């Protein structure tokens, strides 16, 4: 399967053959894509939420009032969960939200996400992702030629420093080396731009 190679000026400069098993899967499995995105988002959660229990909250251990004769319900501590300023029962604890997902499913998710973008006409192959200077204004003008609202840019094994620096201040534009290609960013950005090197490395990686 062949597709156009574009320059950063959005002009056709050649053709490239793409592996249909990676970029043109016939039946897109949205369930797999969602499964991988859920796995990614859960793994990214910090999980540092925490409340103090009765044993951790600050306060006296003295009995509030005597056991009998006051007419009140008996109390043993001012730090109990029912007391104002007391501990919290069954509150959130520091934990990892990460779940396990087989590598084969993760690989399938990436393949189906790339295929979905290609089917939409939103996956473009660029001849080179290199800039002479790390100028944000230059990169903004380049991206405007593609008429997209957000871009996920995937380069080869290494990212051009000038391109990376220029993209840092651009809203909804992310550039990563091929190892950083992931389902969540592919789906949430309108356009996916791949360098020629990224295509060959991804095909080798996902074969």
From Swiss-Prot:
GO cellular component: ribonucleoprotein complex; ribosome
Disulfide linkage: none
Subunit structure: Part of the 50S ribosomal subunit.
PANTHER family in the cross-refs: 50S RIBOSOMAL PROTEIN L4, LARGE RIBOSOMAL SUBUNIT PROTEIN UL4M
Location of region: Disordered: 50-75
This protein's record includes keyword Secreted: no
Function: One of the primary rRNA binding proteins, this protein initially binds near the 5'-end of the 23S rRNA. It is important during the early stages of 50S assembly. It makes multiple contacts with different domains of the 23S rRNA in the assembled 50S subunit and ribosome.
NCBIfam families to which the protein is assigned, alphabetical: rplD_bact
Keyword rRNA-binding attributed: yes
GO molecular function: rRNA binding; structural constituent of ribosome
Native species: Rickettsia felis (strain ATCC VR-1525 / URRWXCal2)
Domain of life where this protein originates: Bacteria
Name of the protein: Large ribosomal subunit protein uL4
Gene that produces this protein: rplD
Family from the record: Belongs to the universal ribosomal protein uL4 family.
A biological process from GO: translation
